[in-house]
């Protein structure tokens, strides 16, 4: 029987709630009035993630007592209709229904356009009314822009004009990716935002930075002396950062075709993880010290060249047992027949500094692959002066599995049990659901929302981080488009194009295929 996995909808234990509240007291005044405004309240992100996350935090008493949630969108909605749209995703238990009703009482809705002032003025009136209800205490404001990039500029401009605090409270703006389409558009967006808000008011959210195992990267690196001496080019052969999905584009093909997997996943999620793997130890756990070190990594990274990239596009595989497998990417009616948008990409990043020179970083991501997982795989070099028969020793690997089944394990060689002296691969395994059975790991959005409330920007993307990340990938994106590079076809449910494996082999990655980690059973 597999060990029980705690759902993100499970309540956090009372002891942990008290501990969290105590640690938050320094940065969060629980009695002060707050408004959390969701722009794009009728959209999928709001229904599937934002409202459910706010409910879980509210249920667990981790939000300020005096808070109001305001949805804003163009749709003609009531609070009742809004509730219907997200309630099933909140997974409310029978004994939580009264608390959920209290949560809904704190929700309201403002209908308005994004490109005119009238709706924003109504929003400000709603905030003013809330302030009057709160004995005229100044209201802290959090604005979540769960919107397409096409309206970022106009919405942020109207916000600045109509809905800012008056200096006796604070305003924070949360921006959802994509943060631009390339280096130029990203810089234009950043320049626009800089005219309206200070850097400490802007929270560019990359939910991968809130995941438990991504958070664990810094602790693993800088909290364990045993790893520090080997974390460099003398001992590490390569680093592979993977993001694999076992489903296709589904209903997102129209949007996805304008972006592609490099913009959708590699430029943000994978590049952020790369910086955490490669950065030097920061001077402190202060947000700016950490982000300074991440920027140094991005500055040292070379621009990715076309010869170091493989792009692919999935095709139908009717024989594969999956409801989407009978349809390839271009079989979707919303995708142009001549689309060259990649659904798979592998890029090799080279970091030109003393620690990492000569160590390839493989960024690999794709849809419709053979499994769903995200992981960081550190492959170490061979043992010097090998005394065992040729080929018996395999490279050791440290693997941090981000999702699913969060785990850290070290693949290494041990003696085969018995009378002989043969060796075999095994692992030292820390599977979170096995080791921490009673702990419910927080959802990434829960963690990040709390950090915005507390004013912590450790896990949010700074302007210069964004610029240097785009600098690395924009030239190859432009070259792929200019040369109309045809993606390599791969079957739905496969490992992806074999050309990707060949490119990794070219740079020294060794895939033996003799060992596979299996999530432990109880």
Swiss-Prot record:
Protein name: Glucose-6-phosphate 1-dehydrogenase
General function of this protein: Cytosolic glucose-6-phosphate dehydrogenase that catalyzes the first and rate-limiting step of the oxidative branch within the pentose phosphate pathway/shunt, an alternative route to glycolysis for the dissimilation of carbohydrates and a major source of reducing power and metabolic intermediates for fatty acid and nucleic acid biosynthetic processes.
Residues reported to bind NADP(+) 2: 364, 373, 377, 401, 409-411, 429-431, 495, 517
GO molecular function: glucose-6-phosphate dehydrogenase activity; NADP binding
Gene name linked to the record: gspd-1
GO biological process entries: glucose 6-phosphate metabolic process; glucose metabolic process; NADP metabolic process; pentose-phosphate shunt, oxidative branch
Record keywords, A-Z: Carbohydrate metabolism, Cytoplasm, Glucose metabolism, NADP, Oxidoreductase
Catalytic activity: D-glucose 6-phosphate + NADP(+) = 6-phospho-D-glucono-1,5-lactone + NADPH + H(+)
Main localization (coarse): cytoplasm
SUPFAM superfamilies cross-referenced by the UniProt entry: Glyceraldehyde-3-phosphate dehydrogenase-like, C-terminal domain (SSF55347), NAD(P)-binding Rossmann-fold domains (SSF51735)
Residues noted as binding NADP(+) 1 in the record, renumbered to the chain: 40-47, 74, 177
UniProt-annotated catalytic positions: 269
Origin species: Caenorhabditis elegans
Binding site for D-glucose 6-phosphate: 177, 207-211, 245, 264, 367, 372, 403
InterPro entries tied to this protein: G6P_DH, G6P_DH_AS, G6P_DH_C, G6P_DH_NAD-bd, NAD(P)-bd_dom_sf
Pathway connected to this protein: Carbohydrate degradation; pentose phosphate pathway; D-ribulose 5-phosphate from D-glucose 6-phosphate (oxidative stage): step 1/3
Pfam families: G6PD_C, G6PD_N
EC number: 1.1.1.49
Domain of life: Eukaryota
UniProt family annotation: Belongs to the glucose-6-phosphate dehydrogenase family.
Transit peptide recorded as keyword: no
CC per GO annotation: cytosol
Subcellular location: Cytoplasm, Cytosol
């Amino acid at each position: 029987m597999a060990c029980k996995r705690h759902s993100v909808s499970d309540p956090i234990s009372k002891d942990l709630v008290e501990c969290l509240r105590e640690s938050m007291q320094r940065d969060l005044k629980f009695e002060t009035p707050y408004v959390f405004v969701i722009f794009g309240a009728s959209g999928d992100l709001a229904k599937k993630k934002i409202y459910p996350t706010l409910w879980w935090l509210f249920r667990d008493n981790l939000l300020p007592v005096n808070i109001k949630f305001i949805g804003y969108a163009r749709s003609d909605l009531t609070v009742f209709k809004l509730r219907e749209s997200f309630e099933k995703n909140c997974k409310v238990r029978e004994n939580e229904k009264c608390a959920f009703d209290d949560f809904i009482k704190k929700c309201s809705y403002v209908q308005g356009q994004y490109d005119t002032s009238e709706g924003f003025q109504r929003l400000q009136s709603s905030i003013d009314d809330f302030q009057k209800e709160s004995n005229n205490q100044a209201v802290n404001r959090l604005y979540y822009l769960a919107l397409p990039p096409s309206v970022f500029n106009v919405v942020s401009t109207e916000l600045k004009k109509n809905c800012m605090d008056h200096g006796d409270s604070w305003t924070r703006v949360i921006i959802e990716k994509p943060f631009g389409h390339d280096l130029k558009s990203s810089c234009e967006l950043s320049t626009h935002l800089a005219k309206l808000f200070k850097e400490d008011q802007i929270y560019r959210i990359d939910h991968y930075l809130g995941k438990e195992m991504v958070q664990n990267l810094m602790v693993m690196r800088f909290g364990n002396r045993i790893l520090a001496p080997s974390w460099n080019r003398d001992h590490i052969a390569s680093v592979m950062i993977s993001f694999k999905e076992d489903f296709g584009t589904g209903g997102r093909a129209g949007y996805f075709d304008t972006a592609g997997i490099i913009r959708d996943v590699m430029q943000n999620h994978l590049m952020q993880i790369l910086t955490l793997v490669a950065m030097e130890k920061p001077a402190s756990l202060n947000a700016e010290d950490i982000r300074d070190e991440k920027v140094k990594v991005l500055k040292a990274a070379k621009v990715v060249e076309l010869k170091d990239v493989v792009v692919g596009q999935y095709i139908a595989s009717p024989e594969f047992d999956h409801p989407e497998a009978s349809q390839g990417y271009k079989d979707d009616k919303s995708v142009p027949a001549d689309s060259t948008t990649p659904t798979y990409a592998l890029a090799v990043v080279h970091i030109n500094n003393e620690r990492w020179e000569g160590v390839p970083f493989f960024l690999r991501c794709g849809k419709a692959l053979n499994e769903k997982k995200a992981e960081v795989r550190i492959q170490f070099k061979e043992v010097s002066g090998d005394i065992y028969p040729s080929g018996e020793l395999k490279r050791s690997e440290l693997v941090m599995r981000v999702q699913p089944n969060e785990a850290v394990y070290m693949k290494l060689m041990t003696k085969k049990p018995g009378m002989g002296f043969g060796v075999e691969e095994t692992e030292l395994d820390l599977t979170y659901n096995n080791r921490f059975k009673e702990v419910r790991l927080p959802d990434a959005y829960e963690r990040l929302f709390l950090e915005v409330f507390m004013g912590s920007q450790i896990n949010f993307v700074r302007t210069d981080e964004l610029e240097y990340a785009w600098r690395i990938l924009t030239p190859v994106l432009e070259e792929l488009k200019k040369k109309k590079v045809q993606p390599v076809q791969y079957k739905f449910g496969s490992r992806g194009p074999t050309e990707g494996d060949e490119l990794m082999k070219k740079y020294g990655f060794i895939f033996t295929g003799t060992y596979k980690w299996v999530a432990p059973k109880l």
